[in-house]
């Protein structure tokens, strides 16, 4: 509420402010998560998404390929998904192998995994430590998306 006061002489009148301005607080910041509770990475201009999931106990990285809505699996025929991560200030490359998910058609996979890599075990403790780029070929087109955590 806003109120103003001042002196204007003998015949001053006081008028209370009856209308206030309501200001809404912004909604709390929410991270975008995919159907497997992982971090979403945009591929192309919302054409596809990659969902990056990290299991801290096993140090296993899983990338799910999702459709434009980031809700449904999108099985692809890629041999792998390339991941470049920044570890100790250096860019390191990793390949995640296809592990077809339930319902993926023969010869295609919507899930790609990397388990037991010593560099990941030593340096990545949770999802927030993942900084880098996902690279994948879907159909005949190459896609790249940044893993970034906005706070």
What are these regions (language model features)?
Residues 1-3:
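Sec-dependent N-terminal signal peptides
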Residues 5-151:
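Intrinsically disordered, low-complexity terminal tails/loops enriched in metal-binding residues
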């Amino acid at each position: 509420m806003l109120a103003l006061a001042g002196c204007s002489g003998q015949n001053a009148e006081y008028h209370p402010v009856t209308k206030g301005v309501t200001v809404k607080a912004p909604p709390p910041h929410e991270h975008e998560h995919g159907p497997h509770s992982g971090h979403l990475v945009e591929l192309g201009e919302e054409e596809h998404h990659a969902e990056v999931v990290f299991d801290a106990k096993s140090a296993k990285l899983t990338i799910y390929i999702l459709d434009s809505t980031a809700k449904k699996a999108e099985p692809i025929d890629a041999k792998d998904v390339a991941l470049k991560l920044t570890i100790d200030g250096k860019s390191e490359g990793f390949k995640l192998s296809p592990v077809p998910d339930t319902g993926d058609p023969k010869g295609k996979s919507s899930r790609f995994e990397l388990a037991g890599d010593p560099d990941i075990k030593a340096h990545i403790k949770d999802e927030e430590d993942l900084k880098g780029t996902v690279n994948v070929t879907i159909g005949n087109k190459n896609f790249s998306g940044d893993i970034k955590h906005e706070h």
